[in-house]
Amino acid sequence: MPNEKNVVSFRAADGNTVKLEYIDSLPSAEALAREYARSGYPDRYAVFTERQTSLSALGEVISEKDSEKGLFLSCILRPSIFPSQAGCIGPLSAVALAAALEEHTMKNIGIGWLSDIYCDGIRIGTTSVEGKLDDFTSYEYLIVSFAVKLDPKKFTPRLTDMVKQVFEDGNQSISMIMAKTVLNRFFTIYKEIKAPQKHLNHYVDRFVLKDKKIKYIDEGKKKTARVVDINKENLTLVIETKDGRRISVSSRSAVIIPNKI
């Protein structure tokens, strides 16, 4: 178990206790959370670092010399839900991260597809969800991860200044306060996971790719298309090709979405 001085407990907005372990630098918060989950760590145990050395906030593999500073947060869940009920956790985690950033920065934060986070037209972070099923087709664990690079190269300087102004609070770092805010926002939404429609509506409202040009893969070739919208029922991406055809895309690997829109 980790040294207790690196772990803080707090009551989340939904009334349940969350344990948050801080480590100043990690190759991957998600990888450590996965290791903890397999070792039996409890529900709502989160791992947080401000410096990640093997994976960027956008999910790209990096070297240690290119390590990123920011918010890298992964939380273990042990839910009593079936896979069919878990499909919306990814989009809902993006709603939580966007709301947390917006709460503290006074900036309009948008969501791409399915879980990319945008500010001022630049992709600044993402969320992800992974899990392991037990022998009864329910989850042994889920891990929900949040990542945002707090760097002027990804954030505009004005956004960085606003974050610093709001987050200065005693000895807590900017990112630590943000991590707690993200978890509070997420668990407020997560408690309604079996009836998530109003939160999915927030996802649709924050969608920023409408009318943007992206690439899609057609018979192994990259082609340009315009984003029409997202399907509000199943969150598939609706695109229009150059010849006017409309296609519904359900796989993230079938499209290439730029980091700057």
List the model feature ranges, each with a label.
Residues 24, 111-113, 197:
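Short loop/edge segments at beta-strand edges and connector loops
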Residues 2, 15, 79-109, 119-261:
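Long, positively charged amphipathic alpha-helical accessory segments at protein N-termini or as interdomain linkers
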Residues 41-43, 113, 221:
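Short, basic and Ser/Thr-rich N-terminal targeting/leader segments
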Residues 1-102, 133:
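N-terminal lobe of the biotin/lipoate ligase/transferase fold
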